[in-house]
């Protein structure tokens, strides 16, 4: 698809489909066939002849963003796709699947860099859209929340959920996080009915979970309304699964804001 005089958009379907419709769970991992890879190479050859730059868009990640999420999230044959992208000097891809605002960069054997940018899922708080500006030799990327409330007011939409969209979506997100945390407690055998500290654990994890999906570092202000932080962390350390603890540590260690303006040059 032509974006402007200089750029083409290349939409790639990496999903795997069942021959038996509606039976069993869908496949989560993704793969590009050898036929598709050859077609991609041909498209890049054509673009090169016409002096066009290509922006590839794909569901599965072309670079691993988190080691714990490599299986089923990074394209099964991402290395083969990256070989083509490095060959033609493509510096970035747009992908999704992990639902979290993030970017990850990989370096080729001859020191070329390629960045995979994931825009957070529009269906979950804070409902990001990506804004991309183009020049002849660079793009500027930034993620920002959709201004749904402004649109609802401008168009006289009276639906209360749309007029207070941010708070509505945050409530849904927090509710989902609470269910995840209580599931961890119950499955791990450390849920105790009527223990008030467990609700604080759920609030604490919900705040961290929000920071992860929003692509922002956790700020002390995000936790200021949660008392007993040390007790909460100790309870988690003593009882939660290794995966759960590692997930929270990864969020606490992050110092990068993945929504900030990012410039990528050819």
How should these model regions be labeled?
Residues 18-32, 150-164:
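Acidic/histidine-rich helix-loop elements
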């Amino acid at each position: 698809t032509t974006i402007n005089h200089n750029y083409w958009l290349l939409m790639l379907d990496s999903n795997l489909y069942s021959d038996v419709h509606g039976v069993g769970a869908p496949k989560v991992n993704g793969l590009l066939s050898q036929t598709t890879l050859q077609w991609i190479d041909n498209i890049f050859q054509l673009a090169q002849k016409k002096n066009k730059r290509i922006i590839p868009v794909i569901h599965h990640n072309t670079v691993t963003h988190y080691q714990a999420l490599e299986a089923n999230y990074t394209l099964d044959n991402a290395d083969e796709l990256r070989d083509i992208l490095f060959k033609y000097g493509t510096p970035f891809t747009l992908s999704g699947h992990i639902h979290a605002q993030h970017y990850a960069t990989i370096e080729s054997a001859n020191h070329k860099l390629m960045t995979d940018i994931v825009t957070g899922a529009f269906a979950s708080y804070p409902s990001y859209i990506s804004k991309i500006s183009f020049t002849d030799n660079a793009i500027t990327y930034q993620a920002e929340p959709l201004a749904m409330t402004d649109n609802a007011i401008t168009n006289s939409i009276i639906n209360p959920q749309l007029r207070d969209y941010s708070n509505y979506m945050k409530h849904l997100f927090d509710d989902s996080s609470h269910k995840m945390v209580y599931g961890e407690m119950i499955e791990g055998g450390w849920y105790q009915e009527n223990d008030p500290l467990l609700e604080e654990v759920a609030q604490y994890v919900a705040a961290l979970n929000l920071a992860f999906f929003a692509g922002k570092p956790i700020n002390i202000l995000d936790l200021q309304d949660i008392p007993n932080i040390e007790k909460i962390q100790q309870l988690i350390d003593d009882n939660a699964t290794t995966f759960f603890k590692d997930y929270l540590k990864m969020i606490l260690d992050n110092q990068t804001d993945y929504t900030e303006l990012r410039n990528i040059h050819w």
